């Protein structure tokens, strides 16, 4: 039987547990959601805890601001952990009070709610800026002509378009530069801000060019615009057709009102004020138009980066992160990649760090583009890969290690081969991570490699839960086909063709009475 002293100890321990329980129950009512508290606590340090390394050492993996400032490249098939890794980065950036811009081609609802909840937890709701192509009525505005000189704006617009004919590209560049010199003059000297619709009007007709010339007071700029108007022939208008079409597709799109909104994003000011910007591009709905929108924003970042380096002392430059999901869809040609690589190489000095994510290196058709992107990013995470070429390249990127290859000499024996005790031992170099390792990674598991100093490992990415703020949902009624009339233009056209044919055969019917 237990002694009285043991009974007293047991009673004391039980009483302590009960006291602690009731203390928390009575005095911690109304506190924040435990998940929110845990998230806030985990984001207190300056470094981002991404997860835990399982090879070569078991230890936490943390990324510093230097890692982000020297750019991060994330690869992985859908559903294997890319979004979770990005979530760790943007959650830390928001909770630390730093600036952020994320281009989300998927326009994921969960990401939008993550940003709203994180800003609320960090008491930064006034810093949140949402540009949403799916909901232009509630979106922040964006004007590509707000920041930059005429040459910068020309390069921004030309770079957003995929060109197949160099001739039409050159004609468009020359025309844009002339017109934009006038628009920039009006913006900077008269405070008259133009938008893409104004630009489209100015390059579409002689009347538009002439109207612009009348507004400009500076003699040399006005003379150049008048010269453009004088040579505005039918052939010249045809040469500009591609440019006009591309601008029309943006201005007249369902999200075209974003370009004309009074509440407009100023990228330079947003960086300096550490704003939290989410751009929902909705590539599934708008596809090519969404990609052009994303390219315009990236070009604005390049202009803002240059303005920061030129005008802001180094100690006053904020830490601003740029996250680009489905990167390869936005930067899809060699010219675009060269421009973006130039931005990567220069934006470190302005305090901008870039994180790009996409599926595999096979997304880049041009090998030059592939090499440029790999060389310009210092840290790489690769989740499971199925493309053999990508696996081979990534294994080479991580590198090799020295090991000894041993061989044994055998001889035939009655009961099979037997060792003779002789053999060789040769020093060889083998992959640290064989290509097959990249093919067989589990969900949430990635190979990590970084330069300067050289680091590598296998990491299990940390899953974080962001408690969402309850919001009233607006249900959108889907149109019912049975309640609508079908236009059926083709059926109507065939019907009229039949009537016309019958009229030809019937001499009593007057053909002019029929509409074709």
Language-model regions, residue ranges each:
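Transmembrane alpha-helices and immediately adjacent membrane-cytoplasm interface residues
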Residues: 11-30
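Hydrophobic alpha-helical transmembrane segments
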Residues: 2-14
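P-loop NTPase motor domains
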Residues: 27-36, 43, 53-57, 65-352, ...
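Short loop or secondary-structure boundary microenvironments that flank
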Residues: 105, 283, 384-387, 463
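Conserved ATP-driven motor cores of ASCE-family P-loop NTPases powering translocation/secretion/packaging/pilus
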Residues: 146, 151, 234, 341-447, ...
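A short C-terminal helix-loop "cap" of Rossmann-like NAD(P)-dependent dehydrogenase/epimerase domains
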Residues: 459-461
């Amino acid at each position: 039987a237990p002694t009285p002293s043991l009974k007293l100890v047991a009673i004391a321990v039980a009483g302590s547990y009960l006291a602690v329980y009731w203390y928390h129950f009575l005095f911690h009512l109304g506190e924040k959601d435990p998940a929110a508290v845990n998230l806030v606590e985990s984001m207190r340090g300056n470094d981002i805890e991404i997860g835990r390394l399982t090879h070569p050492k078991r230890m936490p993996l943390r990324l510093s601001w230097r890692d982000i400032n020297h750019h991060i490249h994330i690869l992985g098939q859908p559903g294997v952990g890319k979004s979770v890794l990005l979530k760790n980065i943007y959650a830390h950036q928001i909770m630390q009070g730093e600036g952020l811009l994320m281009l989300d081609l998927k326009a994921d609802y969960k990401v939008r709610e993550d940003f709203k909840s994180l800003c609320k937890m960090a008491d930064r709701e006034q810093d949140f800026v949402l540009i949403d192509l799916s909901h232009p009525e509630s979106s922040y505005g964006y004007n590509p002509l707000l920041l930059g000189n005429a040459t910068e704006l020309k390069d921004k617009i030309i770079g957003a378009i995929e060109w197949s004919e160099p001739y039409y590209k050159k004609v468009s560049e020359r025309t844009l530069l002339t017109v934009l010199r006038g628009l920039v003059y009006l913006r900077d000297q008269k405070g008259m801000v133009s938008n893409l619709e104004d630009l489209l009007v100015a390059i579409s007709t002689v009347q538009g060019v002439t109207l612009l010339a009348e507004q400009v007071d500076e003699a040399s700029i006005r003379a150049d615009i008048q010269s453009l108007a004088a040579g505005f022939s039918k052939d010249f208008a045809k040469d500009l057709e591609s440019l006009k079409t591309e601008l029309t597709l943006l201005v007249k799109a369902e999200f075209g009102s974003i370009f004309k909104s009074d509440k407009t994003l100023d990228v330079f000011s947003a960086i300096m004020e550490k704003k939290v910007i989410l751009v929902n591009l909705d590539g599934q709905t708008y596809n090519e138009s969404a990609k052009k929108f994303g390219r315009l924003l990236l070009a604005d970042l390049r202009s803002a980066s240059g303005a920061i380096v030129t005008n802001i002392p180094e100690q006053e430059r904020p830490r601003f992160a740029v996250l680009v999901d489905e990167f390869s869809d936005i930067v899809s040609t060699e010219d675009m990649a060269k421009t973006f690589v130039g931005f990567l190489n220069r934006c470190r000095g302005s305090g901008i760090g870039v994180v790009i994510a996409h599926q595999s290196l096979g997304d880049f058709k041009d090998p030059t583009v592939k090499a440029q992107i790999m060389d310009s990013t210092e840290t790489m995470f690769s989740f499971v890969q199925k493309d053999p070429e990508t696996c081979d390249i990534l294994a080479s990127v991580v590198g090799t290690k020295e090991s000894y290859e041993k061989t044994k000499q055998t001889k035939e024996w009655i009961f099979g081969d037997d060792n003779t005790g002789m053999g060789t031992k040769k020093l060889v170099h083998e992959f640290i991570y064989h290509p097959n390792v990249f093919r067989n990674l589990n969900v949430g598991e990635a190979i990590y490699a970084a330069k300067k100093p050289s680091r590598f490992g296998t990491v299990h990415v940390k899953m974080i839960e962001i408690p969402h703020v309850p919001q009233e949902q607006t249900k959108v009624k889907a149109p019912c086909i049975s309640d609508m009339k079908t236009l059926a233009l083709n059926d109507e056209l065939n019907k009229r063709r039949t009537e016309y044919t019958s009229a030809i055969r019937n001499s009593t019917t007057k053909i002019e009475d029929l509409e074709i």
